[in-house]
Amino acid sequence: WGHLENGVIVPAKAPIISAHCVRVAVADGHLATCWASFEKPATKEEIIERWRTFEGLPQKMNLPSAPHPFLQYFEEDNRPQTRLDRDFERGMGISLGRLRGDSLFDWRFVGLSHNTLRGAAGGAVLIAELLCAQGYIPKK
């Protein structure tokens, strides 16, 4: 989290997020349990709506590997699950669920990503597409 200022990455002050990644005995997929606090209180409905309507730069630029939508939220108490949800948007999307209030932080939730399609290979391809689209990698 943060922004670039005078060539230096300046960490963001908010939201405060704590996360723990859980590797389970499946071929692909990582679950992350996350806790978040916000400067301005947010309702569960507001958070889910922000997730559902979020568009990052890859979506706005309509990059070939960019998932549309980037995030999906599950209302079910047992989702996301690695075997069921890791391939969302060809493995490039992120699945979220189990959003609940928390006594220490404001909220907690579970996130799921495909560790090879989104993480390693697909993530590298998406970054290359972004760098090309922004002119950092010139066309030959």
Regions found by a protein language model. Give the residues of each.
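Generic C-terminus detector
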Residues: 104-140
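C-terminal substrate-binding/catalytic lobe of Rossmann-fold NAD(P)-dependent oxidoreductases
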Residues: 1-106
